[in-house]
Structures are given as structure tokens and as C-alpha cells.
């Protein structure tokens, strides 16, 4: 794997490009809508105080320029851009190029399986490999935190090739890699698509045009029992789906297990007291007379159409009853159209 093309110029794209290039693990190219803002040299500042300097071989808005001849593609994009990017790169993909994503739970595999050749190698991280932040666009970024290891999935190649590719990812990203059973285990999660959407419905389902709130809500600090009850119901429906899918039993913990809780009351206490969540605010915007929900925020534009929707579609396909998820999804999609 000598040539990797990073697709997308966000924080993860900056860090992945700089980190891999600086460690000379591959020739790094970048596909971005703003090539004029990028330097051929990008610096990544690590938690250890290091400054890694990576040289990029090519930066372009033309997929033909940077995708042609690439051995690996890594999408660092929000869910709503994945379909468009797949269609953009498709004509220039080598038949043996591994096309992947930095985060699998925003619909990458569901779209790639529809758009790309059924033989095209696909891969993806279950969770993002880095916590990242842009310092100066196209020039520098902060790598704020690493995962201790990565769960990835690889599709449409032999078991031997999967293992070889996992070894390459471990070397390129500097952490051990565990191969998941299939793309479903990377794509289906009860984090953002369940956690966020259940809370948003509880906060805003009664809102209508003309209502003004006096202030912006805390998203987690005021997590209440009603929000926790809805989250538990949606999580139960999600696990009913997993029971009929070809996934490894227990590959994900339930919401109650993950947050070391036993009922809605204890879950509400737990979610409202996690230090890392303290101060995070609900997606709202200031208008004349107060505050209203911001339906253009990522909470809405990502987690409903590019998270919960795929869970619901699989439920329908497999005959799994999902009344709570159906209700929440229908409401959320009505706000994002």
C-alpha cells in the first residue's frame, strides 16, 4: 500500500494526512474542494508535544488527479457528503483499491455497496482513530488523543488479504488493529444515532413555530428520566435488530451496561454527571425573543438521515418491530427536509 488518498479536508483529514506522511508510511494525496488553501507540508502537533511534519505528494479538487493509481482511499467526511464523494471517485478507482472511511456509522458501507462495484475492496474504522482539531486550515492540526487500538472491517477480499491490510493499517496509524466480523459490526452503533436522537426528540418534539425558549439548553447536564426511558426503549429495539443480524453477540454493550446503570433513573444521573459531557449545549440558535432548535446542526443533519435511518431500514427489511425508533426517526426527518 504505497499511495493513500485522503478524501476530505476536515480535522480528521488534516491529522490523518499529516500523521501518515510524517511517518513515511505511504505517499499521501489529498482530495479537497479547497486545494488552494493547502500547503504541501502539513504539521501535526501530538499530545506528547511532538510536531510531526508531513509532505503531501498531491493536493487537488480533481478526483482524476489524486484517485488514479491510489492503493487506499480514506473518506474523512460527514455522512451527507459520502454518496456524492463515492460517485465522484468511482470512475478513477483501481479494481484493487481499498476504499474506506474514518468513521463507519454514518452510512459509508450502505452507500458504497449500492454505488461501487460488488468486487471493490471496502474498509472502515468502527470509531475515529484520532481526536483532532484544525489549527490553521491546510497547514496544521492538533492530534488531541489516540485510541489504544482500532476496530476495523474489510470487505470483498480474502481472509489473508484482510489480515495483510489490517497489518498495514496498524503500521500506518501506529496502533494495534482488531478485525471485526463484517461491515455491520462497524456500521451499527448505539452511540450517536441512538443517544443523540432520543435526547433531541425529548427536548424538541413539542416545539412549534413561534415558541421561544429563554436560554440554550444543556444537552447532557440536564438529562432527565424521560430522556433516559426513551433511550432505553430505542436501545432495546436496536438490540432486537442485532439479534437477527450476522453479528457477533456482545460486540456492543447495551446502553445500560456501557454507562454502568440499571434503570432510567440511574442512567439519567450517570449521563448528567459525566465530566467529558459537562457544558455541551443542545443544538439551538438565538433569534428575536429567545432561542429555538437549530435543525441545520450536525445533530439533525447527521444522526437522523445518516445514522438512525439505516438502523430503521434494516429493521424493516428483517421484520423487526421498532415503534420508538420509527416515531423518533419520522419526527427527525421531518425537521431535516
Feature annotation, model-predicted:
Residues 32-34, 63, 103, 126, ...:
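Residues at the C-termini of beta-strands that transition into short coil/loop
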Residues 135-234:
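Substrate/ligand-engaging "lid" and interaction regions
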Residues 74-75, 79-141:
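Rossmann-like NAD(P)(H) cofactor-binding subdomain of soluble oxidoreductases
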Residues 41-46, 111-116, 164-169:
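Short, aromatic/basic amphipathic alpha-helical patches
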Residues 70:
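An anion/phosphate-binding loop that grips the pyrophosphate of nucleotide cofactors and donors
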Residues 27, 57-58, 121, 178:
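Conserved beta-strand segments of alpha/beta enzyme cores
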Residues 207-215, 221, 225-337:
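NAD(P)-dependent Rossmann-like dehydrogenase/reductase catalytic/cofactor-binding core
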